Amino acid sequence: AKIAAVSVAKGNVTSDAFLVPGDSPLKEVADLKGRKVAVAKGSSAHGQVLLTLRKAGLSTKDVTLNFLQPSDAYAAFTQKQVDAWAVWDPYTAQAELEAGARVLATGEGTSNGYTFQVAGTAALSDAGKNSAIKDLLIRLAKAQQWADTHREEWARAWAEETGLKIEVARAAVDRGGDLPVALDDAVVKSEQDLADAFSEDRTLPGKVDFAKFTDRRFQEDLKAARGGNS
């Protein structure tokens, strides 16, 4: 592998959602059988689709997956070209507030909520770049902690930088953002389970050993920046 996950943060999985239109007759995940579901291919939401369908006794053979990036999926969803949309914040909040979307299922019990920072192995082998990567990861972890304790300021900055409506940014931020956690065995196992789901669905061409794509060299350095998070 030419890349490695070097740090991880965990978000609130209630923001990872299967959305349906407000007037949809669908009441539970099992009702998705025979329906069209929009999702970004290879995304965390795609993984959530696989695991959520499995939990409901279904598979991707029971639904039609429309692989669309969020902006295209939003258009398809609002025009009712698809029956459901699997996505994350701020798109979840945007669809709820602007399109009257209803949450059919959240990521609770299926999504792990992890977001990884990845570095090139060549950069990790370079002393100068290695030091710069460590500095960046520490700054990011501190920024994530700050954003969580300064939610209104973060929501305003996010809205200003991205063009999100402030109420959408606030709704997403209020659910809780990504917070740094330790890149430990539990994280690796959880991500391995997700990789296995992708392999079983043949989205990935074969078995992937996620541990081989991790590098934990910065974990001690990040401990203080993580604060109360393990």
Q: What is the predicted role of each segment?
A:
Residues 1, 56, 98-99, 162, ...:
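Residues at alpha-helix termini
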Residues 1-59, 64-67, 83-86, 104, ...:
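Short, glycine-/small- and polar/acidic-enriched structural segments
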Residues 196-230:
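Conserved C-terminal helix/tail region of periplasmic/extracytoplasmic solute-binding proteins
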